[in-house]
Amino acid sequence: MGWFNGPPSWAEMERVLDSKPRRAGESAAPEPDGPLSRGRATYRPPDEGRAARSSVPYAELHAHSAFSFLDGASTPEEMVEEAARLDLRALALTDHDGLYGAVRFAEAAAELDVRTVFGAELSLGPSARTEAPDPPGPHLLVLARGPEGYRRLSRQLAAAHLAGGEKGKPRYDLDALTEAAGGHWHILTGCRKGHVRQALSDGGPDAAARALADLVDRFGAARVSIELTRHGQPLDDERNAALAALAPRFGVGVVATTGAHFAGPSRRRLAMAMGAIRARESLDSAAGWLAPLGGSHLRSGAEMARLFAWRPQAVTAAAELGEQCAFGLALIAPRLPPFDVPDGHTEDSWLRQLTMTGARDRYGSPEHAPRAYAQIEHELKVIAQLQFPGYFLVVHDIARFCRENNILCQGRGSAANSAVCYALGVTAVDPVANELLFERFLSPARDGPPDIDMDIESDQREKVIQYVYDRYGRDYAAQVANVITYRGKIAVRDMARALGYSQGQQDAWSKQISSWSGPADSPDVEGIPPQVIDLANQVRNLPRHLGIHSGGMVICDRPIADVCPVEWARMENRSVLQWDKDDCAAIGLVKFDLLGLGMLSALHYAIDLVAEHKGIEVDLARLDLSEPAVYEMLARADSVGVFQVESRAQMATLPRLKPRVFYDLVVEVALIRPGPIQGGSVHPYIRRRNGVDPVLYDHPSMEPALRKTLGVPLFQEQLMQLAVDCAGFSAAEADQLRRAMGSKRSTERMRRLRSRFYDGMRALHGAPDEVIDRTYEKLEAFANFGFPESHALSFASLVFYSSWFKLHHPAAFCAALLRAQPMGFYSPQSLVADARRHGVTVHGPDVNASLAHATLENAGTEVRLGLGAVRHIGDDLAEKLVQERKANGPFTSLLDLTARLQLSVQQTEALATAGAFGCFGMSRREALWAAGAAATQRPDRLPGVGSSSHIPALPGMSELELAAADVWATGISPDSYPTQFLRDDLDAMGVVPAARLGSVPDGDRVLIAGAVTHRQRPGTAQGVTFLNLEDETGMVNVLCTPGVWARHRKLANTAPALLVRGQVQNASGAITVVAERLGRITLAVGSRSRDFR
């Protein structure tokens, strides 16, 4: 296994589990099957050596990375690597309006021994950089002179972004910048958008002198330098001479820069293309205004000396200034704010009191649960030793807020290993009963704060986030950023746009990309011009824009902007850091993850619906986790809508695993992640579970840790327990081993711990090296693959709860899932179709019966779709309609409705199409005919001024037309499925319905047909593509080998519905059709798939 290769392939894991040798010619370190879903790996410098010491000292003081978002074409790491190769004395990173790349820049520079200068180019104009091809307004280039200058710059960047009121529009106050500088900044006159160069271009030398005088008055002559650049343009020399001539008059320095926007010359074309994208133009149309970038790459001191031979002192002055401004990003990270505890308490004592109070509720008295209380004492001691009581108090406070506001939440991940978290009500898993290792969560050797993920029902999460802002103050709390990078589809689309291809061509090429990872000969890029592919390849993985992390929040004891600027997110009332979670971790910012979980919302809705319509109060904590009927349902793979086990891969595994007890659900959650199992391979656990393979242990000392998973290591906690049992590690040492073997592997730590493991196993058990080799190899193989058992336990509870509702209250379960959309694996159409197959009647929307969202009728046995699901209506208008009905009674007619609610023609016609006027005794065609006239009748208009309201005799719609209308209006056909209208034709062709495939002998060839609901090609599947087809009787999993997919690629990639001839595989109870040929069927009713998600 290699150090940096990520999780092993399934085939490699099976080989390790079975203690088999590698096959001849097989690499010891196979390439990973797909992209890692882990955090950013530790930066590793390239192998190429550093250039010889340059004879001409030079520092680049004006450089943009890709974190200037479409105005830089190299990563900060690439810029540093090139600076090291060129032997620059220092490198400044001066991205637009932010310090987005500062941490990556600092990490790479530390590895390569490059001195760092931190700065930013401030956009002083009134508009966003992407609002116009060449937005007006000057720029100010600021270099921080040391840590204090950095702090002041960061605070001013944050102030400007927040003052702008919206994302991407910082509003600077030049007077405030002047006051903030305080001698801790150095100002360069900058590029063509700088005050001085802009004045020179617009008004000549006198105007330039006035602009320079203003900068000197504001910041001081010792803190201002004239910047000269030379990009090979005709007027470069004339402009530089005019600028340099101003220096003696004002007593300022002169420095040479390249104004770099990329590391090396090879990225010039990409930089131009990104500039065109920024301006929403093509390269051809942007050519007239796009800034020249021919020479905008890093250069050596010798090359700069040749370019500025007429003024060599400008080159050496740049080196001197760079060395003056350079410093390392050794920021002292803020701590958590002191937690407000009652008088007479410290944070430690208050945490102890809260924990012991909760422990009595969870465990009873200490006499009844001595193990639990001993574990709590141990954990409290470690927490106090590491000075983390405030962290736990903050998390407890968030959980308390959720409970008091009737918001479902639960901690998950490694936090569930903590008895303190369990006692505080943060987690729902008893770590003592489940024998979980606390050190997986927190140990004395840990080099950072613990990581507690809080799952919060998604529809209520915003309340929790705003509570944190209100509780700690917006200056002290912010969300963590998510850097949105270029991937295949958007890379091809944007580069095609930059090269001037039409919108339709951009769409077509983008749609044909599924999982393209770069090769120019991939079938995914067939027919796309080479120049598009070349640029798309170059731009892949570069930042495109800044998003917001799914739930990470940082809380500090001093303004966060002292360390990192904050700006507005797109979402209303959300402020976000300019750094992602990896940057925050590297600097030591304390992060809390408040994650929205749709299933928690669905469960809450289900609880409320069952209570309201059936009078049954459901307490999730009191459900019988051993109920056989729940496990029987899951063993049939009847799990559409069920949390975590509804994917096709999970459904294929459930009949093989045949869950019987709760722990089987824990294993099921861990077995299939992140997606379907690699095509054709079956996990050794299932073979052992079904008695096909014997349960074996390489050494008796492994049995205690692996007994409950039949000798197969699945969980990270088992890896740690094996180190304890086999080699005598302490729990803290075992956690060090787990982390050393993890995604950020350390060669030196691995070497030391490997030696410790071998010595320990020899001393403790006298095991021979052959046995130790096999044991250690298994630990290494599963270090990355292993799932936290605590995480699986937390999720398994939700698997059971959602399964229980599906079994006992299918109508409420369906309505709850519809309310909680968007969530889960299946579309609302598939969820409703599954509910019908379970005997649930579903009614369409009705203006006098529906709520804004889905609800129940007929004593909770039938579902009524919500008005918010109707096209053009939405939740707000739907809620307004419902409130009007409640306040003033049911609507008596279409005209009564439109008189009381001013609906547009479009909205009225959409409701008519959805059948929402059936309560008025109108057919759909009649309602559609009358909708326009009714919508134009207003109290302020004379009667009859609108369209004619006379409704002629109209024929009713056919079932097919009704279904098409339903799907158009709501995306759901409540009482039909598109394939049923073709059933006679399909029967005549010999097509087997999905529900009858179970009776087809294994290996037989069949013809099946259905709407495509999903297309997936997981990275672990060796090129296999999985399709999910659905007809009116059920669903079927279709496996397409790479050869079949290649032969039918265009059809398979785009057809809404398919005819598939293939071979049935159902020997294990999980039905799959291995496709041999694909054909098209045409559905009269629309259907959409969820592809490659």
UniProtKB/Swiss-Prot annotation:
Q: Which SMART domains match?
A: POLIIIAc
EC annotation?
A: 2.7.7.7
Basic and acidic residues biased stretches: 12-25
Keywords of this entry: Cytoplasm, DNA damage, DNA repair, DNA replication, DNA-directed DNA polymerase, Nucleotidyltransferase, Transferase
Q: Where in the cell is it found?
A: Cytoplasm
Q: What class of enzyme is it?
A: transferase
GO CC terms: cytoplasm
**GO BP annotations listed:** DNA repair; DNA replication
Task: Return the Pfam families for the record.
Answer: DNA_pol3_alpha, DNA_pol3_finger, HHH_6, PHP, tRNA_anti-codon
MF term (GO), any: 3'-5' exonuclease activity
> Where do the record's region annotations for Disordered lie?
1-55
Principal place where this protein is found?
A: cytoplasm
Q: Does the keyword Nucleotidyltransferase apply?
A: yes
Reactions performed catalytically: DNA(n) + a 2'-deoxyribonucleoside 5'-triphosphate = DNA(n+1) + diphosphate
Q: What this chain does, per the record?
A: DNA polymerase involved in damage-induced mutagenesis and translesion synthesis (TLS). It is not the major replicative DNA polymerase.
Q: Which family does it belong to?
A: Belongs to the DNA polymerase type-C family. DnaE2 subfamily.
HAMAP family, from UniProt? DNApol_error_prone (MF_01902)
Q: List the protein's name.
A: Error-prone DNA polymerase
Q: Which organism is it from?
A: Mycolicibacterium paratuberculosis (strain ATCC BAA-968 / K-10) (Mycobacterium paratuberculosis)
Q: Coding gene?
A: dnaE2
